[in-house]
Design a protein with these regions (language model features):
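ATP-binding N-terminal substructure of ATP-dependent carboxylate-amine bond-forming enzymes
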Residues: 1-103
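Residues that mark the start of a beta-strand
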Residues: 2-6, 146, 192
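Active-site nucleotide/adenylate-binding loops and adjacent lid/helix of ATP-dependent enzymes
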Residues: 109-188, 197-200, 226
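ATP-dependent carboxylate/phosphate-activation module, predominantly the ATP-grasp catalytic core
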Residues: 183-190, 194-244, 251, 262-289, ...
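Conserved protein kinase catalytic/activation segment
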Residues: 255-256
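Peripheral (often C-terminal) accessory segments that flank ATP-dependent C-N-forming ligase machineries
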Residues: 282-313
């Protein structure tokens, strides 16, 4: 297979992890990287780097993507920033009409989980327990302190605050876009689970993780939990999942409670790739060929540790 891959946001941690997966896949690929910044390490890791406009400038970004797709004979686009994932989801019909292939989840899954408030409603409808959640404007102090305040959109922990009193609530509420209030799950047992489906089979892989600064996974232990497998299969079935998503759960009182779902490849993608769960490669293969290829076996035990690295020029 000889294909050109367009990978966005190569200045970010996620893109670098995806790039490692692709390079170890054995596929014959040329990776063209884009980013809004040029002074980044990622541009030295790809075969060709092109500076990109911001996705929020929709008309300019749409033209940029259309032009580069044609000029570079791109086979597939992998968006790796939240704003770019949102852009491609919003313009799905446009790119479908042009037969431009993009690595994004199916519309039904995106509609169910892109909004964090809608996520809790969707999961409850599926019979899955979630933290009690309110829109900020409807919240009447039904929850005791501490509780969580976060934005309805986006991923990661940048817009997540633990609120301990009225002053903190008023302060962060005014500084958070589209805030929601959520029950605080008082547990140190946190798990991250990748769910991949090609529309026929469902693959599930979980880590029990320890978080470091910025909410990044610093230590990840491979685990097999039947309850997480059951939750994942219900989610995949109910949204007819096509693609890879990531659910974050805490174990509280013996129950696994999802509190976040990310609608893209997650930052632990290379960790699980190392253990044989190669969802980034499977997804690319499936979009390009209609098959995930040789899945092989993935490991049921092991530990990953995150370390810092440097690139010198």
């Amino acid at each position: 297979m000889n294909n050109n891959i367009l990978l966005t946001a190569v200045g970010g941690d996620l893109s670098c992890s995806i790039l490692k997966c692709l390079k170890e896949s054995g596929l014959l690929l040329k990776v063209i990287g884009t980013d809004v910044n040029s002074n980044i390490a990622g541009k030295w890791l790809v075969d060709k780097f092109i500076i990109s406009p911001e996705a929020v400038n929709e008309d300019e970004y749409k033209k940029f993507i259309s032009d580069i797709y044609k000029e570079e004979e791109v086979s597939i686009i992998i968006p790796a920033s939240e704003s770019e994932v949102m852009f491609f989801q919003s313009h799905r019909d446009y790119f479908d009409c042009k037969n431009i292939k993009v690595l994004i989840v199916n519309q039904q899954a995106y509609d169910a989980f892109a909004d964090k408030y809608i996520t809790t409603i969707s999961l409850n409808e599926f019979g899955i327990r979630t933290p009690v959640t309110y829109l900020s404007q409807e919240f009447k102090k039904e929850l005791q302190y501490p509780f969580i305040l976060k934005s309805r959109t986006g991923s990661g922990s940048n817009s997540v605050e633990i609120i301990h009193n009225d002053d903190e609530y008023e302060f962060y509420k005014e500084r958070t876009k589209d805030p929601i209030v959520q029950e605080f799950l008082d547990s140190d047992e946190e798990f991250t689970t990748a769910i991949y489906s090609d529309g026929n089979t469902v693959e599930v892989f979980s880590f029990k993780r320890v978080l470091g600064p910025g909410g990044m996974t610093f230590i990840a232990d491979v685990v097999e939990e039947n309850a997480l497998l059951e939750i994942s299969n219900v989610i995949a079935e109910r949204v007819s999942l096509k693609g890879s998503i990531n659910i974050q759960t805490k174990r509280l009182g013996g129950a696994f409670i999802p509190f976040e779902i990310n609608m893209r490849l997650s930052s632990t993608v290379y960790m699980r790739h190392h253990f044989g769960f190669c969802d980034a490669v499977w997804w690319v293969n499936n979009v390009l060929t209609g098959s995930i290829g040789d899945k092989g076996k993935y490991r049921s035990s092991g530990t990953a540790y995150r370390v810092n690295d440097y690139l010198f020029r």
